UniProtKB/Swiss-Prot annotation:
Name of the protein in its database record: FMN-dependent NADH:quinone oxidoreductase
Organism for this UniProt entry: Marinomonas sp. (strain MWYL1)
CC cofactor note: Binds 1 FMN per subunit.
Similarity annotation: Belongs to the azoreductase type 1 family.
Catalytic activity: 2 a quinone + NADH + H(+) = 2 a 1,4-benzosemiquinone + NAD(+); N,N-dimethyl-1,4-phenylenediamine + anthranilate + 2 NAD(+) = 2-(4-dimethylaminophenyl)diazenylbenzoate + 2 NADH + 2 H(+)
Length: 197
C-alpha cells in the first residue's frame, strides 16, 4: 500500500489556493491508488515549536544524557522524520507570505533537517538521505511564477533537495490578488496536475 505524506502550511484553510491544488493532486492520486494511504501534516492547524536554544541543546546532548524535557523536544523531530521515512511520496503546499514561506513551514524544515537521519556530511558536501519523490504546490498574491522576489518556491525546492527528496514538479498559482492573471495561473496549474499524476 502506497503512502502519501502531505504537508500543508497555509493559514487560509480551505480557501487556500495552494491547499486546493494539493487537494486536486491527492484526489487524482487516490483514484489511481485506491488502496493508498494519505498522512496529513498541517503545520498551521498544529504548529510546531520554533527552534530555541533549548532545542539545539537537546539535539546536541548525547541521547543517554538527555533530560526528560530534552527527550520530549527531540521526539518532535523524531515523529516528523518517521513520517517522511514511511512515506512513498511527499507533497508540500505553501503560500507566499512576505516574499517567503510561512514560519510554520520553516519550523517543520528545521525539525526534520537532522544529520545522520535526513542528510549526512561527506567530503564533497552534504548528501540527502530521504530518497523519495516530491511535488510542490505554491500560491502567491501579487507575483507570478518566476518573479525575482520569489524566495518561496526556491526555498522549498532547495530544502527538499537537501534532504534527498526528488522534486518531480512544482505547480504554482501566482498572482492570486491580480484578477484574471491569477485565475489563469490557477487553472493552468490544475491542468498540469491532471497530466502529472
Amino acid at each position: 500500500m502506497a503512502t502519501l505524506l502531505r504537508i500543508d502550511s497555509s493559514a487560509s484553510g480551505e480557501n487556500s489556493k495552494s491547499r486546493q491544488l494539493a487537494n486536486e493532486f491527492v484526489e487524482k492520486w487516490l483514484a489511481k491508488n485506491p488502496e493508498g494511504k494519505v498522512v496529513a501534516r498541517d503545520v498551521t492547524a498544529n504548529p510546531l515549536p520554533h527552534f530555541t536554544g533549548e532545542t539545539l541543546g537537546a539535539l546536541f546532548t548525547p541521547e543517554e544524557n538527555r533530560t526528560a524535557e530534552q527527550q520530549a523536544i527531540v521526539a518532535i523531530g523524531d515523529e516528523l522524520i518517521a513520517e517522511l521515512e514511511a512515506a512513498d511520496l511527499v507533497i508540500v503546499s505553501a503560500p507566499m507570505y512576505n516574499f517567503g514561506i510561512p514560519s510554520t513551514l520553516k519550523s517543520y524544515f528545521d525539525h526534520v533537517a537532522r544529520a545522520g537521519r535526513t542528510f549526512k556530511y561527506t567530503e564533497t558536501g552534504p548528501v540527502g538521505l530521504v530518497n523519495k519523490d516530491a511535488y510542490i504546490f505554491a500560491a502567491s498574491g501579487s507575483f507570478l511564477a518566476g518573479a525575482p522576489v520569489d524566495h518561496q518556491v526556491p526555498h522549498i525546492q532547495t530544502f527538499l533537495g537537501f534532504i534527498g527528496l526528488n522534486v518531480k514538479d512544482t505547480f504554482i498559482a501566482g498572482g492570486q490578488a491580480m484578477g484574471e492573471p491569477g485565475e489563469d495561473a490557477f487553472n493552468q496549474a490544475k491542468s498540469q496536475i491532471a497530466v502529472a499524476v
